[in-house]
Regions:
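Conserved class I S-adenosyl-L-methionine
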Residues: 23-33, 118-139
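A short SAM/SAH-binding and catalytic strip from SAM-dependent methyltransferases
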Residues: 93-104
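Core SAM-dependent methyltransferase catalytic element
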Residues: 149-173
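A short acidic, Gly/Pro-enriched loop at the edge of an enzyme's catalytic core
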Residues: 83-95
């Protein structure tokens, strides 16, 4: 049994980020916290094995306790950092990071060739919309916000497949 998520609205950016990744078999959630993102991914991809990693042993313990009985071993959590992931090379089809910046080289190491890295970032459970949101997104682009993420992707040898956000439904920036 998997416990229901407490923070489902905050996971909207993660849901949008993994819309187009097919059916991954092995998923890693970086900086998983108490497991909301990993639990969401387990529901979204019912045949996948989901692993969460977090630098805090306390949060890893809390996340593991939330999983409940998982006789299939589909969901598990480990302590680790984005710069030193405790997993073998070329292991995951999908690596996700919700409000965390993964270490590009280490992420590339654990991601299988052809796999996906989905980074979802927001500072609010509600996306910015309307005139104020459009103005802020325009201003962020002018200040180089997009190049920061695309540059980070390039550090690990990644190509940006999709960059979206701001409006509900993932309208492009």
């Amino acid at each position: 049994m998997i416990e229901p998520m407490a923070k489902a609205p905050a996971l909207t950016p993660l849901a949008a980020a993994v819309l187009h990744v097919g059916e991954p078999e092995r998923i890693l959630q970086i900086e998983c916290g108490e497991g909301d993102g990993a639990l969401f991914l387990a529901r979204e991809f019912p045949s996948a094995r989901v692993r969460g990693v977090d630098r805090s042993g306390e949060r890893v313990h809390a996340a593991a306790a939330r999983v409940g009985l998982d006789p299939e071993g589909r969901i598990a959590f480990k302590q680790g950092t984005p710069r030193s992931l405790p997993f073998p090379a070329d292991h995951f089809d999908l690596v996700t990071a919700l409000d965390a910046r993964p270490a590009p080289a280490e992420t590339a190491r654990v991601l299988r060739p052809g796999g996906y890295l989905a980074i979802a970032a927001s500072n609010s459970p509600r996306p910015l919309s309307g005139p104020t949101g459009r103005l802020l997104r325009w201003r962020l682009r002018r200040l180089g916000y997009e190049p920061i993420w695309t540059a980070a992707a390039g550090e690990g040898g990644f190509s940006v497949v999709r960059l979206a956000g701001g409006e509900p439904g993932g309208r492009s920036l």
